[in-house]
């Protein structure tokens, strides 16, 4: 599932990979509710969570450009749900469904972590090394966060409560 992004301008478009065709193909899905780039996601093609991001369409003083928005994908449509506690973009996400996820790091090199339980975000223990443009994988209770800006090789393991520094990447990079 591919959703949102900077084209430019930012898009709310959704595309699904169709494995029912011999070589596979992308098909258009329902658009998200807010066009934004630099957002994060977690889940599968039928149970996805999209959160955070940046939307130039919103500008002060009416609305901030960095978004706290969260949307859930059920395999057919996006539904707006509760916002993150801290609006940010350039963050990473981890999790295997739209009911259990992590929002990790993000703009201004923050180390914030939030957990999603299917209806609300909760503040959790921060990364040891604050950063943005990082990558992550895993579940909401066992995740790995790595790389990021400012061009770090740091890797950290999440156990559902705390982040622990583990062996670094051989080469620091940003996503």
Predicted regions and their residues:
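Polar, enzyme-active/binding microenvironments
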Residues: 1-175
């Amino acid at each position: 599932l591919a959703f949102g992004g900077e084209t430019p301008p930012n898009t709310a478009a959704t595309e699904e990979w169709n494995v029912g065709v011999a070589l596979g193909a992308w098909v258009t899905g329902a658009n998200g509710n807010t066009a934004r780039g630099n957002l994060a996601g977690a889940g599968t093609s039928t149970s996805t969570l999209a959160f955070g991001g940046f939307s130039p369409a919103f500008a002060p003083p009416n609305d901030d450009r960095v978004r706290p928005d969260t949307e859930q994908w059920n395999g057919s449509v996006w539904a707006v749900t509760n916002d993150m506690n801290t609006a940010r973009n350039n963050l990473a996400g981890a999790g295997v469904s739209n009911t259990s996820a992590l929002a990790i790091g993000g703009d201004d090199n923050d180390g914030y972590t939030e957990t999603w339980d299917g209806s609300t975000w909760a503040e959790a223990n921060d990364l040891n090394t604050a950063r943005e443009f990082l990558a992550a994988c895993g579940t909401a209770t066992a995740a790995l966060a790595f790389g990021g800006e400012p061009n770090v090789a740091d890797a950290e393991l999440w156990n559902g409560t705390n982040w622990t520094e583990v062996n670094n990447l051989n080469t620091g990079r940003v996503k």
